[in-house]
């Protein structure tokens, strides 16, 4: 559905694999390679366990002693997707509310986004390093309306809290963690695995590779004149 005839667009943008070129959680797991993490990843992707349970399980395989090494590694290796800075500037220029809604973890989401902010809001999971292994905290869990009740950062619940009846939702994402949000969006801008799921389920989408593509899509859909 085109959004040019709808009012008050609000953008909900994923972080891992969307703002960043790679999925930072997967990058961490590949680098530190705790035994059993790949099995958990496959269970998340085939939806045999919830995203919340799976991501928590993966991080529980890592000792807290690795905290500094993990943080240093993820901040060094993360690559911001081409055009993101221009895209953020565009949303400010056009007065389009932009929320980052991420299944990622605060210790890398906030530092990586800091040069580009401020944003209208950043929603992500948190890490607790007080025990023997890394424990995840989920401050943005599912509301009563969520059908899965197993999200980590529940993107549809965040969207429902922010939107009014007059708002139009634009979801930008790449993975299984964006699927439930895509199902309720007025416009989906997708890449990678999310495209496969949209095609499988008959969800209309626009494809992107860089954030220059995203800006062009929004220009066309919203009828923005620069």
Task: Show which residues each predicted segment covers.
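Metal-dependent phosphoesterase signature
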Residues: 54-86, 94-96
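Active-site neighborhood of HAD-like aspartate-dependent phosphohydrolases
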Residues: 2-60
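Long, low-complexity, intrinsically disordered polar/charged segments
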Residues: 7-11, 15-16, 59-63, 68-72, ...
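Loop/helix-junction capping segments adjacent to catalytic residues or to phosphate/diphosphate-binding pockets
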Residues: 19-22, 81, 179
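Catalytic cores of large soluble enzymes that bind and process phosphate-bearing ligands
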Residues: 20, 50, 76, 147, ...
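Short, surface-exposed acidic
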Residues: 36-42, 67-71, 118-119
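C-terminal cap/substrate-recognition subdomain and adjoining C-terminal extension
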Residues: 83-97, 104-226
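Conserved phosphate-coupling serine/threonine residues in phosphotransfer and NTP-handling enzymes
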Residues: 14, 102-104
